[in-house]
Amino acid sequence: MYRMQLLSCIALTLALVANGAPTSSSTENTKKQVQSLLQDLQLLLKEINNYENLKLFRMLTFKFYMPKKATELKHLQCLAEELKPLEDVLNVAQSKTQNSIDIKDLMDNINRIVLTLKGSETRFTCEYDEKTVTAVELLNKWITFCQSIIST
């Protein structure tokens, strides 16, 4: 009588382990991708901090939104939603000066990594903080997020 329930339980457990449980290799791969994202965000922040022209600095005061809580990879959906406005602001700023990096390539790489890390789940809705942040603050907060993911 209990044999069927036991077999069902074992089958379900095996299915969950095979399909859903993270393995050490997937965790390592995730950490490598987060490390890549961290490096790209730091490069972007460095580039923004190199702007010396006051007009460019004013452009970088454009306001962005941060989620109320950013602790899991699914919260990268919130970063993904802010990438296009950030790229637009940086492209305008870059057109006013001669910068050493290609913003478009860097933003494409960041976007690709974010989409890979957050997965195809699109039902997650970001809850944004009411307080807005500058581009520098946005990048600093996401850099901190990446560092916390790597350290766990």
Swiss-Prot record:
An annotated GO cellular component: extracellular space
Localization, UniProt: Secreted
Signal peptide: 1-20
Positions annotated as glycosylated: 23
Family: Belongs to the IL-2 family.
GO biological process assignments: adaptive immune response
Keywords annotated in UniProt: Adaptive immunity, Cytokine, Disulfide bond, Glycoprotein, Growth factor, Immunity, Secreted, Signal
SUPFAM superfamilies per UniProt: 4-helical cytokines
Protein name in UniProt: Interleukin-2
PROSITE patterns: INTERLEUKIN_2
Disulfide bond in keyword set: yes
Domain of life according to the entry: Eukaryota
One term of GO molecular function: interleukin-2 receptor binding
Organism name: Orcinus orca (Killer whale)
Disulfide bridge positions per record: 78-126
Annotated TM spans: none
One Pfam family from the record: IL2
Keyword RNA-binding: no
Function: Cytokine produced by activated CD4-positive helper T-cells and to a lesser extend activated CD8-positive T-cells and natural killer (NK) cells that plays pivotal roles in the immune response and tolerance. Binds to a receptor complex composed of either the high-affinity trimeric IL-2R (IL2RA/CD25, IL2RB/CD122 and IL2RG/CD132) or the low-affinity dimeric IL-2R (IL2RB and IL2RG). Interaction with the receptor leads to oligomerization and conformation changes in the IL-2R subunits resulting in downstream signaling starting with phosphorylation of JAK1 and JAK3.
